[in-house]
Regions:
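A short, internal acetyl-CoA/4′-phosphopantetheine-binding micro-motif in the GNAT/acyltransferase core
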Residues: 70-86, 143-144, 245-254
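Aromatic (often tryptophan-rich) hydrophobic motifs at membrane interfaces
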Residues: 205-315
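Hydrophobic, Leu/Ile/Phe/Ala-enriched alpha-helical segments that form helix-helix packing faces
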Residues: 13-16, 99-107, 209, 268
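A conserved beta-strand-loop-helix scaffold within acyl/acetyltransferase catalytic domains
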Residues: 2-44, 48-61, 116-253
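Conserved acyl-donor/pantetheine-binding loop and adjacent beta-alpha core of acyl/acetyltransferases
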Residues: 57-74
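Short, high-confidence coil segments that cap the C-terminus of an alpha-helix
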Residues: 36, 105-108, 215, 271-273
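Terminal substrate-recognition subdomain of acyl/acetyltransferases
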Residues: 104, 111-167, 272-275, 280-319
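Conserved acetyl-CoA-binding loop-helix of GNAT-fold acetyltransferases
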Residues: 85-101, 252-266
Length: 319
């Protein structure tokens, strides 16, 4: 692949209005530190599909992995107008087979990608020896009607919100970046694991997103000024994405995270947001918390392929 591919990909994105934010060149520049490339599927010199990717070093091997703080990547297809269903399926298969063959030529030790939930088929990858795991996100798609949204929450969540609204909590958008990050890391520390992304990763992405007015930082504090919970959101047109959320373990019993999420949903609705995507999670405790807000469960696919037996062994050993 060459820099010409990146330039063509940038042009492709400019001509593709429905390109998801996590496949936009500015996002890729931020998460990959500009060290990324793109596979391009063409018919008659026209780009119909693209698949950006970046290389990572892990356990001493070169891999292609899902970038940090990025819920989905994978491919995107610019479907021609008035395409018959059978031709749409055929285009998906041809594009996926092409990308699978190109990745096979690159031959990383391991390949992994999370596809956008709009893709319901992975046959082109399946026929080339790739594996698939179904994951789940939750999405609010009726934010124009907050009464309906509230009615879909569990009884416990509705009671909790009503109770907390009477208490002296304040939502801030100006918490210093370092403090915001450190509150989030407390969630991982409680579980005895390291935060999967560094402050530098977060700082770089926030700088790029804030420059485009596409990020929002929320922190909920009590009357003593203690920060109970934080949530980081990326906004893309009428779709908002939750990127991460964390709470101070010593203050978790306040349930302030519930009130914070409801505040964010109300603000998203006020900004004419049509969809709020929680972007996960398959972790039981997180899934339970999100599910009780009554959002729509939406499956999406993780595609992967192991090329190195030694890498696979080390990966299993580490986990």
């Amino acid at each position: 692949m060459t820099n010409a591919n990146k330039q063509e990909y940038r042009q492709f994105c400019e001509q593709t209005p429905d390109m998801p934010v996590f496949l936009q060149p500015w996002w890729l520049d931020a998460v990959y530190c500009e060290d990324w490339d793109a596979l391009l599927y063409k018919e008659k010199d026209n780009i119909l599909a693209a698949m950006p990717y970046g290389r990572h070093k892990k356990y001493g091997f070169t891999t292609i992995l899902q970038p940090k703080l990025t819920p989905t990547t994978g491919l995107w297809i610019a479907y021609p107008e008035n395409l018959k269903r059978l031709n749409r399926y055929a285009l998906e298969i041809k594009a996926m087979e092409f990308f699978a063959e190109q990745i096979d030529k690159i031959k990383p030790a391991y390949f992994q990608s999370m596809l956008h939930f709009s893709f319901t088929s992975w046959l082109g990858f399946y026929w080339h020896g790739y594996k698939q795991t179904t994951r789940y996100t939750y999405r609010f798609t009726h934010l124009e009607d907050l009464d309906y949204t509230f009615s879909q929450c569990s009884t416990e969540v509705r009671k909790c919100i009503r109770k907390l609204e009477k208490q002296d909590f304040t939502v801030r958008n100006d918490l210093p970046l370092k403090q915001f990050y450190e509150i989030n890391t407390l969630t991982y520390a409680r579980q005895g694991v390291k935060c999967p992304f560094s402050f530098e990763d977060f700082e770089r992405i926030e700088a790029a997103a804030a420059a485009r007015n596409q990020s929002r930082r929320y922190a909920i504090c009590d009357k003593e000024g203690r920060v109970h919970s934080v949530t980081y959101v990326i906004c893309s047109g009428d779709v908002w994405h939750s990127i991460f959320a964390g709470s101070d373990p010593e203050l978790r019993s306040s349930n302030a995270a519930t009130l914070l999420l409801w505040h964010i949903l109300k603000e998203a609705s006020a900004c004419s947001c049509k969809e709020y995507n929680f972007n996960g999670s398959v972790m039981r405790s997180i899934e339970t918390f999100i599910r009780h807000f009554g959002a729509e469960q939406t499956p999406y696919m993780m595609i992967e392929k192991h090329y190195s037996k030694l890498y696979s062994f080390l990966k299993r050993l580490k986990h």
